[in-house]
Every structure is written in structure tokens, then in C-alpha cells.
UniProtKB/Swiss-Prot annotation:
Heparin acts as an important cofactor, producing 20 to 100-fold accelerations of SERPINA10 reactions with factor Xa and factor XIa. The record marks Y261, D314 as: Essential for interaction with PROZ. CDD domains: serpinA10_PZI. Residues 56-65 have a biased composition (Basic and acidic residues). Residues 136-153 are annotated as: Heparin-binding. The modification Phosphoserine is found at S56. Inhibits activity of the coagulation protease factor Xa in the presence of PROZ, calcium and phospholipids. Also inhibits factor XIa in the absence of cofactors. This is Protein Z-dependent protease inhibitor.
């Protein structure tokens, strides 16, 4: 029996031009040293002082951990809500297949925020829904993303790889603090480039991205403006393996309903076993949980009535998803799920403008933390390309999964044979890694 892997790749690009952008860099958070008590008339013995200091430090450490955990949860929640807002903006222009990475977008824009200050920085925070975190320490946001990145990369079962490039014009003066902070928080690799030779720069950058994405995106750049000074590229590669595998032996060509009148034939995978699901009576939709190895999950949202999938998008929030998860019950089920591959590219700067992030794309951008010429810089382009592939390729899985269905019981069936939404979460952090919609599984 084969494990079904899901390959998901997201690449985000931010391009900076010399035309109009800031101030001292954020410092890493420091915990103030505990102060000695001086109000006592009699000096406490040295051992007692040490005990008190240890207790104080231990209490501070516990408070720090609790605060950090709450901040991470808030970050995940706000990133998800940002993702749902972005979904609605994309949906106004595209009613077909869709996939993008809210996590990747937030990660890249937070990295860019290291070079911004004043209203430029504030707009990015507000647009990403991150102003609610109200950081009490400098460098909080990048520190949270750094911790999350490191946690995800240590989880080898998850199969998530993330990286960042800064392609910099050879004579462009980037501040050393921006270099150092980008490396510290986002492990950014800086690559000098001659953008005046646009064709050579395009070829070299495509080579880098092709190599890092393992050939999944051989050509990210179609053209390069010779006036470009800096291009930031973030990529996320996710190759997940289902915890409950689909056996390719049972994959058959079946009918998928595009709408009330049109159907197509697609390879439909079949799985039987214990699945968690719920039915939302308010929205009349099935929500199915398909777990990956490494503590990640794909949520599949399938409307009961054909054609209602777009209407649901207006109501998607983190609170709604949390309600679905709380109401889920695990039971023996049969699941039919189509194989599909999506390859989507979006010019995100226009959508981000609509979400209130405007200044960084204008001559009023303040990027003076990025470069000494920061008030003559603006970001010209933010592009995200995401690829997802769900099929039966993979490693051997444990046999006998079908034995969980008893001979005398007809299990419930969920057949994903019409347009649906999917969300891929990392469960420990609650971070929404990818969000998408499949209207036609045979189209990219």
C-alpha cells in the first residue's frame, strides 16, 4: 500500500526599485536582570539571597514561557484571519482553482518590515492583522517567526522546507543591520546580482529557485527590470504523507461535478478507516480532517449544495474553523478524494494595497532601515507562486487499513466530487500554512 504524499510549494517575491523609504533596527529582546532588594535593614544571608534570586528568575522564566505561548497562538490566529481576508480579495478576481500560503506571505512581509519604519511599518502590521499582538519588546514579531520556522524545520516527519533569498544589485548599498537581522530571524541568503544585465540576472535567479524548489518551479522570473535594486524571494516546500493512506489500487476514474450542468472525469482516490469529520448545519457543509504525518492536517470543506462554495468564503474566520474542529467526531468512514495538481501565481501587491498596505508601494515608502537611500526606494512587486500536488506517490504504508471497517456495518461516506476548499494547518502551532479552492481538479 502506498502513502499519498502531498507536495506543496510556495514562492513569494518582493521587488524593490530605486524611486521612494527608515531608522534604528530592532534589537533582540532582553530580560532585565533581577534587582537586589536594598530596603532591608539586615542583609539576608548569601544563601538566602541566591535562593530568592533563583526563585525570581524561575518565576520570570515561567511568565516568559506563558507570554511566548500566548503570543504564538495569537500570531497563528491573526495569520489565519489575514489568509481568509486575502482569499476573499483573490476570489474577487479569480473564481476558479486557487492556492496560496498565508504563512509564506506573512513571513516574507515581516522580513521586509525589518527595513521599514514609521507609517510604512505600521501599515504592514495592520494589513497582516499583526497589530493585535501589541509587542512589548523590540523584535517580537521576527522572533516569533524565527521560533516557528525553527520548530517546523526540526519536525522531519512534517516534510516542510523554507528558505529566503535576497538578490541584491552589486552596487546597491544595503545596511549591514538589515543583512544581520534578515540572517538572524529568517536565515536569508544574500546573493549579489547585476540587474543591468537583465537576461543574465533572470537566468541566474531562475537557476537558484529551480535548485531550491527541487525542480518544481523551473522558471519564476519572466522578465527583470534593469532598474531593480533588490529582489526578496521566500519559498516553502511541503511534501506531506497522509497518516491514513489512500491505496492506489482503489483509485478509479469517476465523475466530478463542475456545476449543476457540467461534469468531468477525474482519478478519484479511495480510503476507508477512521476519519474525523463534522457537518455544519448553519452553512450546510461537510468538514473532513485528513491528517498528515508530522502533526499537520488538511481540512476539506465540501458544501452540501452545488454552487454554494463561493458564498462560504465571506464567512471563513479562525473562530469558525475552531468551531468545526471542536465539533468533530472520529468514526469509521469511506472517503473519496480526487487527485489534483494546482500551480497558481498571483501579483499580490495589488491585493495588499486593497488590504491597506499602500505606502510601501508608493514614492512615500520609508525603507531607511534597509538602505541609506531608503527614502528613494519603493517596493514595485510582490508575487506569490504556489504549487500543490496530491497523488499516490510515496513510501510503503502499514497494510490492513481496510480491516477497521466491520463486515456488517455500512460506514458513512464523504465523496468529494464537487468544488471544495482545503486548508493545511500545522497543529502544534495552529499556523495556516496553505489555503486553497479546487473547482476543477484537471486544471492547474
Amino acid at each position: 500500500m502506498k502513502v499519498v504524499p502531498s507536495l506543496l510549494l510556495s514562492v513569494l517575491l518582493a521587488q524593490v526599485w530605486l524611486v521612494p523609504g527608515l531608522a534604528p533596527s530592532p534589537q533582540s529582546p532582553e530580560t532585565p536582570a533581577p534587582q537586589n532588594q536594598t530596603s532591608r535593614v539586615v542583609q539576608a544571608p548569601k544563601e538566602e539571597e541566591e535562593d530568592e534570586q533563583e526563585a525570581s528568575e524561575e518565576k520570570a522564566s515561567e511568565e516568559e514561557k506563558a507570554w511566548l505561548m500566548a503570543s504564538r497562538q495569537q500570531l497563528a490566529k491573526e495569520t489565519s484571519n489575514f489568509g481568509f481576508s486575502l482569499l476573499r480579495k483573490i476570489s474577487m478576481r479569480h473564481d476558479g482553482n486557487m492556492v496560496f500560503s498565508p504563512f509564506g506571505m506573512s513571513l516574507a512581509m515581516t522580513g521586509l518590515m525589518l527595513g521599514a519604519t514609521g507609517p510604512t511599518e505600521t501599515q504592514i502590521k495592520r494589513g497582516l492583522h499583526l497589530q493585535a499582538l501589541k509587542p512589548t519588546k523590540p523584535g517580537l514579531l521576527p522572533s516569533l517567526f524565527k521560533g516557528l520556522r525553527e520548530t517546523l524545520s526540526r519536525n522531519l516527519e512534517l516534510g516542510l522546507t523554507q528558505g529566503s533569498f535576497a538578490f541584491i544589485h552589486k552596487d546597491f548599498d544595503v545596511k549591514e543591520t538589515f543583512f544581520n537581522l534578515s540572517k538572524r530571524y529568517f536565515d536569508t541568503e544574500c546573493v549579489p546580482m547585476n540587474f543591468r544585465n537583465a537576461s543574465q540576472a533572470k537566468r541566474l535567479m531562475n537557476h537558484y529557485i529551480n535548485k531550491e524548489t527541487r525542480g518544481k518551479i523551473p522558471k519564476l522570473f519572466d522578465e527583470i527590470n534593469p532598474e531593480t535594486k533588490l529582489i526578496l524571494v521566500d519559498y516553502i516546500l511541503f511534501k506531506g504523507k497522509w497518516l491514513t493512506p489512500f491505496d492506489p489500487v482503489f483509485t478509479e476514474v469517476d465523475t466530478f461535478h463542475l456545476d449543476k450542468y457540467k461534469t468531468i472525469k477525474v482519478p478519484m482516490m479511495y480510503g476507508a478507516g477512521k476519519f474525523a469529520s463534522t457537518f455544519d448545519k448553519n452553512f450546510r457543509c461537510h468538514v473532513l480532517k485528513l491528517p498528515y504525518q508530522g502533526n499537520a492536517t488538511m481540512l476539506v470543506v465540501l458544501m452540501e449544495k452545488m454552487g454554494d462554495h463561493l458564498a462560504l468564503e465571506d464567512y471563513l474566520t479562525t473562530d469558525l474553523v475552531e468551531t468545526w474542529l471542536r465539533n468533530m467526531k472520529t468514526r469509521n468512514m469511506e472517503v473519496f478524494f480526487p487527485k489534483f495538481k494546482l500551480d497558481q501565481k498571483y501579483e499580490m501587491h495589488e491585493l495588499l494595497r486593497q488590504m491597506g498596505i499602500r505606502r510601501i508601494f508608493s514614492p512615500f515608502a520609508d525603507l531607511s532601515e534597509l538602505s541609506a537611500t531608503g527614502r528613494n526606494l519603493q517596493v514595485s512587486r510582490v508575487l506569490q507562486r504556489t504549487v500543490i500536488e496530491v497523488d499516490e506517490r510515496g513510501t510503503e504504508a502499514v497494510a490492513g487499513i481496510l480491516s477497521e471497517i466491520t463486515a456488517y456495518s455500512m460506514p458513512p461516506v464523504i465523496k468529494v466530487d464537487r468544488p471544495f476548499h482545503f486548508m493545511i494547518y500545522e497543529e502544534t502551532s495552529g499556523m495556516l500554512l496553505f489555503l486553497g479552492r479546487v473547482v476543477n481538479p484537471t486544471l492547474l
